[in-house]
Swiss-Prot record:
Required for the first step of histidine biosynthesis. May allow the feedback regulation of ATP phosphoribosyltransferase activity by histidine. It comes from the Bacteria. This is ATP phosphoribosyltransferase regulatory subunit. Pathway: Amino-acid biosynthesis; L-histidine biosynthesis; L-histidine from 5-phospho-alpha-D-ribose 1-diphosphate: step 1/9.
Length: 434
């Protein structure tokens, strides 16, 4: 099909082209987060874009399975899947490819996943993730490390108006499973509790043949969110061992997070199950003021690697890079766009000098593009500004002497002639004194 040049080429719903400015911002966010992961001792892993459906589905609940893109493999006849989540891939790799590595394993990744989404929802099908997995440690200290690292990464992006919302799925599951409720009633209640709809919760409970004590424990769940005062209220509702152990766990995690000095960024929500089906203990999500969706989320998943043949406790989380991008776009004081250093504008017929200077600057680590198209000074400067290049170097012409280069600051068109030998010194700085 021939697409007229006057219209935009169509894309499937839920995916986006990211032009250089946005691509720079995404790379900046990913780079900043990756730096934090590496400072905490994590090593990068790269997962494949395709998996066999029957293999990857071992690590997914029904919700993720329904969101998976599938198609036939012409080579094998088997069903292929584009992973909707990277954590099951990590579990497979750890269980089958990293048996010779000692535990604990500290792994991080940058990647993209695809998920089916309702067209009407306006949600993106493509999710950019930067995440970590800590495999082989079953301790509150490991859980606390994930939360503290999430806080540090968000602060490294210049954010301070965020909260990390802590949950504990075993607390919720313990109350639900000990209540005697049917599976259908538990599902209805889970939805109502997630909406903090106490009236709906009471209405559902009135129809259920369970004890009054069980009803009281469940009825309090929509109110179990806020600060640490929530723990005292939750303790009264925890009438089973599983929920009591969950409270002990989150209490110990909070004590460790106090040592990290991140308590001001924390809230607690024990009234619902956050995360995915494979989560099994402490979970958390991060929210930035003014944005309705989570910018990060994760938690403990102690049973996942066992599905691929290697039992090991684990915890981890991932950042939603596009959600963070929305946040940064609302913060004009943050400079996420990557600038380029030089555009080299050559007015001489001989290109040798321009080529040598450009390569010399690149060897010193400066990004340098040559304006190969023949155009005048003003048009080259306009091009540099549009492409977010900081400075333009002019070789030849009447702008300076033969042993000089004319250096122009693109933002305000101010220029100065400098000696070529000064430009090529190892200690050259981009700063121009005008």
């Amino acid at each position: 099909m021939t697409i007229p040049s006057s219209i935009e080429a169509p894309l499937p719903k839920g995916v986006t082209d990211f032009l250089p400015e946005k691509a720079d911002e995404i790379a900046c966010i990913e780079g900043c987060i990756s730096r934090i992961f590496e400072l905490w001792g994590f090593r990068r892993i790269i997962t494949p874009l395709l998996e066999f459906q029957d293999v990857i589905s071992l690590g997914m609940g029904e919700d993720l399975k329904e969101k998976t893109f599938r198609f036939d493999d012409r080579q094998t006849g088997r069903l292929l899947a584009i992973p909707p989540d990277i954590t099951p891939q990590i579990a497979r790799i750890v269980a089958t490819r990293m048996l010779g590595y000692p535990l604990p394993l500290r792994i991080y990744y940058n990647g993209r996943v695809l998920r089916h989404a309702e067209v009407q929802s306006g949600r993106s099908r493509e999710i950019f993730q930067s995440g970590v997995e800590l495999i082989g440690l079953n301790s509150p200290e490991a859980d606390a490390e994930m939360v503290a690292m999430a806080v540090e990464a968000l602060r490294s992006l210049g954010l301070d108006n965020f909260k990390i919302d802590l949950g504990q799925v075993d607390f919720f599951r313990g109350i639900m499973l000990s209540s005697g409720l049917s599976a259908s009633a538990r599902n209805l209640l889970q939805s109502a509790i997630a909406k903090k709809d106490s009236s709906a919760v009471r209405e559902i409970l009135e129809k259920e043949p369970i004890t009054d004590q069980a009803k009281e424990e469940i009825a309090v769940l929509p109110r179990l969110f806020g600060g640490r005062e929530v723990l005292a209220l939750a303790e009264k509702a925890a009438g089973n061992d599983r929920s009591k152990k969950a409270l002990e766990n989150i209490t110990e995690v909070l004590e460790i997070l106090d040592i990290y000095g991140v308590s001001d960024f924390l809230t607690i929500d024990l009234g619902e199950i956050r995360g995915l089906d494979y989560h099994s203990g402490l979970t958390f999500e991060g929210f930035v003021g003014g944005l309705g969706e989570a910018v990060c989320g994760g938690g403990r998943y102690d049973a996942l690697t066992a599905k691929y043949g290697r039992p090991a406790p684990a915890t981890g989380f991932a950042f939603n890079i596009l959600a963070l991008l929305k946040v940064l776009e609302k913060q004009p004081e943050m400079e996420a766009t990557r600038t380029r250093d030089f555009l080299l504008f050559n007015l001489k017929e001989d290109r040798r000098e321009a080529l040598e200077i450009a390569q010399n600057l690149r060897d010193k680590g400066f990004t340098t593009a040559r304006d190969i198209i023949r155009r005048d000074f003003d048009n080259s400067l306009a091009y540099a500004k549009r492409m977010n290049i900081r400075q333009m170097l002019v070789i030849g012409g009447n702008y300076c002497a033969e042993d000089e280069i004319y250096l122009v600051r693109v933002a305000d068109r101010k220029g100065v002639a400098i000696k070529k030998m000064d430009l090529l010194r190892d200690d050259y700085s981009l700063k121009i004194e005008l």
